[in-house]
A protein has these predicted regions:
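Intrinsic disorder/low-complexity segments
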Residues: 74-87, 112-115, 277-286, 295-297
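Acidic/His- and Gly-rich active-site-bordering loop/insert found
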Residues: 1-93
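Metal-dependent amide/peptide-bond hydrolase catalytic core
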Residues: 14-18, 38, 151, 158-159, ...
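Glycine/serine-rich anion-binding loops at beta->alpha junctions
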Residues: 68, 87-102, 176, 326-328
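Short, conserved micro-motifs enriched in small and acidic residues
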Residues: 88-101, 127, 184-187, 342-345, ...
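Short glycine-aspartate micro-motif
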Residues: 59, 88, 144-148, 165-167, ...
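Acidic/histidine-rich catalytic neighborhood of metal-dependent amide-processing enzymes
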Residues: 97-165, 205
Length: 364
């Protein structure tokens, strides 16, 4: 394996918006060997990169960008029982520059064996909305198979959760915090909303498990001695096949003076709910804007590979110009986006073998 090349990939800061530099570096590297290399403008200053051998029927695909901040990379020997292994540490090592490197090594191995009709597709903007994947879908006919590289511990993902994003806003009434009875705190309205949202029982999916949500971009810019007159936030759901439509309906029907959903308060005695007849104050003060997202996705799997469901998103749902999709790659999602992000050399080697095996299983 050309680890010097991997270190060069890791040395390029390709945080979202800056991935064009990595695309240029890789396109020059790949074209120098006489391979067919194409760059596709995404429309926001970034580029997608496609390397082709023959007419691709199978395309290996991952993304160029990484989440901020850029963390310089280094390698170190593992300790204990893994002393013969090596860890590459830093931003993008497993999400997704490890995938870029492993897929490139697999392509070189297939080329050396005289194989053809495959490609390597590197996309911009996966971490910020899959803008590269959406652009490529509209620019290119695709192929029969796409193998999307994400950190799945070298397992084949059987399915992935969907995503749904909503902007939520509350309008309060500012007042001196010593006399809260004369105002309406948008923060308290938000707290009531969160209590109601946590009380909703979304159905558990047999394959993807529970529906979860996270709150981000929370803003209430009031002084500490004045009741908040406004609060905005984003609520981001990870949905399942059972809950995807329900999440949209819940968020649509819980806001505004004419909200269809009613929420109550727990009985002190037995913990059961008293269902309110009227729309709650927090509902009347609440507005919701839906930003959409991806539906939960089922993936193709092959005999002999370990499989598991995953809870993260990828470019795969946007790549509808491919008939069949596989999601598989080295590294662990549990260290992606974190300061301790890393990938093992042994996992990279296993990924190369997996990608070669996938090609031979599907194309032979």
């Amino acid at each position: 394996m050309d680890l010097e090349f991997f270190n060069r990939i890791l040395s390029v800061d390709s945080t979202s918006g800056k991935e064009g530099g990595l695309a240029d570096m890789l396109s020059a590297e790949f074209a120098a060997s006489g391979r067919k290399v194409e760059l596709f403008e995404v429309g926001d200053g970034t580029k997608n990169l496609l390397v082709s051998w023959g007419t691709p029927k199978l395309v290996f695909c991952t993304h160029l960008d990484t989440v901020p901040p850029y963390i310089p990379c280094h390698s170190e020997r593992c300790s204990g029982s893994d002393a013969s292994d090596m860890a590459f540490c830093g931003r993008g090592t497993c999400d997704a520059k490890g995938q870029i490197f492993a897929m490139w090594e697999a392509c070189k191995a297939l080329e050396a064996q005289g194989c053809t009709d495959f490609g390597l597709l590197l996309l911009a903007g996966e971490e910020t909305g899959s803008f590269g994947a959406k652009a490529f879908r509209d620019q290119h006919p695709g192929a029969e198979w796409v193998v999307v590289g994400e950190p799945t511990d070298n397992c084949m993902a059987s399915a992935a959760k969907g995503t749904k994003s909503f902007e939520v806003a509350f309008e309060g009434k500012a007042f001196h915090s010593g006399y809260p009875e004369n105002g309406i705190s948008a923060v308290e309205l938000f707290n009531d909303f969160m209590s109601a949202l946590r009380s909703i029982r979304f159905p558990k999916d047999e394959l993807l498990g529970e529906t979860t949500f996270n709150v981000g971009k929370l803003v209430s810019d009031n002084p500490q001695n004045i009741l908040s007159d406004s609060l905005t936030c984003r609520v981001y759901f990870r949905t399942t096949f059972e809950s995807d439509e329900m999440v949209c309906n819940v968020m649509k029907n819980m806001a505004g003076p004419e909200a269809k959903l009613r929420f109550g308060r727990p009985r002190v005695q037995d913990g059961s709910d008293i269902v309110a007849k009227d729309v709650a104050q927090w509902q009347k003060a609440m507005t919701v804007k839906a930003f959409g997202g991806d539906a939960p996705t089922r993936f193709e799997t092959l005999p002999g590979f370990e499989t598991k469901p995953v809870s993260f998103g990828s470019d795969a749902p946007q790549l509808n110009n491919f008939a069949h999709k596989i999601l598989c790659g080295p590294g662990s999602i549990l260290v992606a986006h974190r300061p301790e992000e890393h990938i093992l050399l042994s996992d990279l080697k296993q990924a190369v073998a997996n990608y070669v095996r996938i090609y031979k299983t599907l194309m032979n």
